[in-house]
Structures are given as structure tokens and as C-alpha cells.
């Protein structure tokens, strides 16, 4: 096969077609999105739901989304920053927090659809593979497909922690154990799954082990790195109880607490307007008579000076 150099002449630029904006920005993988969004033609107006998981530097975001012609519609959303209300006040980006966020999303969605009592899911997290569709239910469970975006998924990724939490919460998300922590392949290409290793990740045992190691090896670094834990009185022995109680609290009340509405406040002081959020400047529009009077005052002032 010969190498052909691309000649970027006038014809090349006339026929050049740019990619979609979000593809140019590296935000959307349209190859994967097309397969996640496309619905079977014999299902007509039935939406196809996606479990969207996104990881940032400070939080884990989980959403149940369906696509329409006018744009995506979010049916339920959960954020790891909400875990503060359920007892998890630190470590909001680790694997255990991702599991709690997925569990919160599942229980919140099923409560909204009034299916929370019908699809309880797995109450005790033990790391074992669980599919809600295998239970004896009167109706089919809520099904969603995992959407990881442009992230390169690897075994043990936090995305699959959110997936496990959503499945244990009662959602039907097709998956296998091959990407969970504890899955390994030997030299003969035979895979084995250690559910106990996955359970340790769900309850933050890996964080507790590192806390114990750092406390013995480098106490100064331990106090610096886990200062937020120490302020709350948390140590390596209390982490598992914290996450276990968070799972119970999420199941008791997964609904997002509403904030009280702030009273509107609009007070004008000259050209400054004071509101409940702050203040800003808005000049008052003067009338025609006021403008003429101001012109007369300027003329009289100039006459007096001359």
C-alpha cells in the first residue's frame, strides 16, 4: 500500500466537514452514544434509559437519562456531596462513596416511581453478583444501560462501584463481574471472582488499611493526609460502620431534602438595588421634565461662572 500525502488545496477545504462540537471538544463519544440511544423500531415511543456516571475531582455524579429529539431528559440524579446528609462527610470520591451514590440514585428513582417496596434489591452488601431480574417479581424491573462517557474503563474503576450500588438498590443494569474489584485472570486465561475483595472496597477497607499503614510508618503524613477524618473523630476501625449506617439511612429516606425558599428582597437606595443575594447598580431613568430642568441648571451655572 503506497503512502499518499494529503494535499490541502482549495478543493480539500471546500469539501471539509467538521466533526460535532462535543466531539471536537472531546466530551462525547458519538460512536458509543449512537448505540446507547438507538431504540428498537418495534418499541415505538418507549424510552431507552441510561445510567450516566461521571467522576470529577470532588464528587461522583450519577443520573438516569433518556434521549429525546429536543435533548436529553434527566429522570433522577444523585451526587456524592449529598452523602453528608446520610453520615458520610469525608472521602466523597472513593469507591465506597461511588457505591453509596449509585445506591442513592436507585432508591430515589424507585421511590419516585412508587416501586421502592416492590424492588428492594440487596439490603446487605456482600460483593456477590446480583441481578434483580432473577428475583420473583410481578413486573419487570427498571432497566438502564451503563454510560461511562469517554472514560477508559479498567477493572476496579469507581464507575463500576456506582453500577454495583445501583444494582443492589433495585435497578436492572446488564453487567458481569469481570470489571469488579476482586476479578482476576490466571495464566491459562481462566477468570475468578473474589466477592470478599469487592466487599472490602464497598466498605472502604482499603482506606482503613492505608490509614493503619501510614499511622505506623509516617505519623506526620498521616495527620496531614487524614486531617478531615481526624477532625470528625474517624479512625480505621470506624470506617466500615460509617458506610454501613449510610446504606441504612439511604434506604430509609432517599428523597432529596428541600431547602426553605428565601424571601425576596428588593430595596433601592439611589442607583443601588439591594436583594437577598447581594447588591447591584441600576441607574434610575429620568423623565423628560427632569432632563430639561437639569439642562437649565447647567446653563445657569455656566452663566454665573462667566
From Swiss-Prot:
One of its GO terms (biological process) is translation. Pfam families: Ribosomal_L18_c (PF14204), Ribosomal_L5e (PF17144). One of its GO terms (molecular function) is structural constituent of ribosome. It comes from the Eukaryota. HAMAP family: Ribosomal_uL18_A. Belongs to the universal ribosomal protein uL18 family. Component of the ribosome, a large ribonucleoprotein complex responsible for the synthesis of proteins in the cell. The small ribosomal subunit (SSU) binds messenger RNAs (mRNAs) and translates the encoded message by selecting cognate aminoacyl-transfer RNA (tRNA) molecules. The large subunit (LSU) contains the ribosomal catalytic site termed the peptidyl transferase center (PTC), which catalyzes the formation of peptide bonds, thereby polymerizing the amino acids delivered by tRNAs into a polypeptide chain. This is Large ribosomal subunit protein uL18. It comes from Theileria annulata.
Amino acid at each position: 500500500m503506497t503512502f499518499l500525502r494529503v494535499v490541502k488545496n482549495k478543493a480539500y477545504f471546500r469539501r471539509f466537514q467538521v466533526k460535532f462540537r462535543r466531539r471536537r471538544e472531546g466530551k462525547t463519544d458519538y460512536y458509543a452514544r449512537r448505540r446507547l440511544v438507538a431504540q428498537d423500531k418495534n418499541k415505538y415511543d418507549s424510552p431507552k434509559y441510561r445510567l450516566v456516571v461521571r467522576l470529577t475531582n470532588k464528587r461522583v455524579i450519577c443520573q438516569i437519562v433518556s434521549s429525546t429529539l429536543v435533548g436529553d431528559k434527566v429522570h433522577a440524579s444523585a451526587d456524592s456531596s449529598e452523602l453528608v446528609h446520610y453520615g458520610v462527610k469525608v472521602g466523597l470520591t472513593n469507591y465506597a462513596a461511588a457505591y453509596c451514590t449509585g445506591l442513592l440514585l436507585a432508591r430515589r428513582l424507585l421511590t419516585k416511581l412508587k416501586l421502592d417496596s416492590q424492588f428492594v434489591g440487596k439490603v446487605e452488601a456482600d460483593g456477590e453478583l446480583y441481578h434483580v431480574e432473577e428475583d420473583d417479581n410481578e413486573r419487570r424491573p427498571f432497566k438502564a444501560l451503563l454510560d461511562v462517557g469517554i472514560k477508559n474503563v479498567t477493572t476496579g474503576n469507581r464507575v463500576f462501584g456506582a453500577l454495583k450500588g445501583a444494582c443492589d438498590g433495585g435497578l436492572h443494569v446488564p453487567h458481569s463481574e469481570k470489571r469488579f474489584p476482586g476479578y482476576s485472570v490466571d495464566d491459562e486465561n481462566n477468570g475468578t471472582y473474589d466477592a470478599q475483595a469487592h466487599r472490602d472496597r464497598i466498605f472502604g477497607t482499603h482506606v482503613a488499611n492505608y490509614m493503619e499503614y501510614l499511622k505506623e510508618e509516617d505519623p506526620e503524613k498521616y495527620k496531614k493526609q487524614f486531617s478531615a477524618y481526624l477532625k470528625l473523630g474517624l479512625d480505621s476501625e470506624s470506617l466500615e460502620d460509617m458506610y454501613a449506617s449510610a446504606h441504612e439511612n439511604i434506604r430509609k429516606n432517599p428523597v432529596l431534602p428541600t431547602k426553605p425558599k428565601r424571601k425576596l428582597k428588593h430595596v433601592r437606595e439611589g442607583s443601588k438595588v439591594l436583594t437577598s443575594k447581594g447588591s447591584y447598580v441600576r441607574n434610575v431613568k429620568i423623565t423628560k421634565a427632569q432632563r430639561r430642568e437639569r439642562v437649565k441648571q447647567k446653563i445657569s451655572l455656566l452663566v454665573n461662572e462667566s
